[in-house]
Amino acid sequence: MSTPTVRRRRLGVKLRALRDARGLTLEEVAEKSNGGITVAKLSRLETARSAAKAPDVELLLDLYGVDDRELRTALLALTREGARRGWWQSYRGVLSPAYEDLISLEAEATSVRTWQIGVIPGLLQTGEYARELMTSIGMSEAVEDKVDALVEVRLARQSVLTRESPLNLWAIIAEGALRTRCVGAGVMRDQLGRLLERGRRPNVTIQVLPSDSPPHVGQMGSYSVLGFEDYADLDVVHVESLTAALYVEDGGQVGVYRDAFERLRAAALSVEASAERIEQIREEHGPR
């Protein structure tokens, strides 16, 4: 991506809206600032390509005649938070830029709707499942050296589900992902138990799409829609491949993924029937 934080994007959207409300062009704002801000800098701020600094934002708010104390305070808070370091940055030598982007987005999202065709969603994985999954897929030696750290990160990501104002997770999982033998039977049994446990949380919804379902849009691959309350136009779709991650930000394309998720939701088992199916498959994996 490498994506600017959602806070930066929100700030850019607000600054653009304030400028538009005053009927000013980029050039007119630059002229009014008497050299305080250039056209290029303002463009970068509005498109979140550059991190904003408080003096620049205060100057713009003055130029736009923003006297509302609460609004000024909120926008300056976004300015400060946009440059805030996340816990994952201490793993910078371990994580790819695309993975850092995903963690940053999850940390700021209010909802995640995820469809997984082959594995358990990362936000619901146990440490043992994550470790065996990573080592069973033929990692390079360079990555194998980082497995411990990657498992730590995988588990740390899950704090978004238990934080104050927790993220709302809706996961639809293909039944085949629950039956896969890519990890040991005991590990899989514990993993399915974790799904049942997490599914009892009020902010977590888990559905299973049966293996005998007719052809469906989800067969095109797994993806997640990260949502941001009050900023639906900033929703992002994350699509992971073997070598890279794709982030879809165009509103029309994001809408296609949202609609596809709704079709998958309608085709999947109910929450109650999904829990029963998970328990049934868990028993099939045998004792620990």
Language-model region placement:
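Short alpha-helical DNA-recognition segment
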Residues: 23-43
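A short linear-motif detector with a strong N-terminal bias
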Residues: 38-39, 54-55, 100-103, 111, ...
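C-terminal regulatory/effector modules of DNA-binding transcriptional regulators
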Residues: 165, 172, 181-288
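Interdomain hinge/linker segments and adjacent boundary elements that couple functional modules
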Residues: 1-13, 17, 21, 27-31, ...
